[in-house]
Amino acid sequence: METSMPEYYEVFGDFHGVLMDKLFTKYWEDVETFSARPDDLLVVTYPKSGSTWIGEIVDMIYKEGDVEKCKEDAIFNRIPYLECRNEDLINGIKQLKEKESPRIVKTHLPAKLLPASFWEKNCKIIYLCRNAKDVVVSYYYFFLIIKSYPNPKSFSEFVEKFMEGQVPYGSWYDHVKSWWEKSKNSRVLFMFYEDMKEDIRREVVKLIEFLERDPLAELVDKIIQHTSFQEMKNNPCTNYSMLPETMIDLKVSPFMRKGIVGDWRNHFPEALRERFEEHYQRHMKDCPVKFRAEL
């Protein structure tokens, strides 16, 4: 089986100092010249940090808590993934061009690769981040289900690649730090996955207020109910079961696996954890952003 898997650097390559999927960068001019609109809302995460969760919450806010409207289509059609390109199957730019305003735009890009038009049009941006140890666990399982991705081999080997920034979208450290710098702009809201798990009501209200809407109790209740982990895991519009099996193998692992804080404890042997934490401290010592790896 493994011999038929694509080689790692056949699929991914260095792009302006960031490891990227070559399918995405093949048509980079389309991304770079993308024309943002002033009322676009950009939702940014490093991969496996809760983009589907926060995206569904934001879409519920835009649709004023109308669950049926949110169930009219898969999330990847309602919130197009800007740089995603899989030849004829998925084209985020094309989807966005065809969307009426106001658009919600998803991206995993580090700040330096974001199309300039988002800054020029002064678009609102939500950046959601998650602690690195849980991200790497979730990313490992994601690698196992994406058909075009190479076999990640052992978890410890994947962690080494993650620490080196040799996974798609590059270094987690650089990504977080680049967006933290941008969050000094009042149009950028910097959020934490762990805060959402701790007190979802507080964080939903924060999102609603950032989007300059009224956080009515009834709306907040509907959003919390509809975007609970179990609801989203069972919802075909959010669990990625609408993607063709040629792209994703959900029999290996569900797209929405656990949705908890601290699952890293079930995967990191002690020696690997110590090595990871030493590496983490070295790279984050000058960054004021503090993460919680457990609640």
From Swiss-Prot:
Keyword Signal applies: no
Domain of life: Eukaryota
Expression triggers: Induced by androgens and suppressed by estrogens. The expression is under the influence of pituitary growth hormone and thyroid hormone. Is regulated by progesterone in the uterus.
Active site: 108
Enzyme Commission numbers on file: 2.8.2.4
One of the GO biological process terms: positive regulation of fat cell differentiation
The protein's name in its UniProt record: Sulfotransferase 1E1
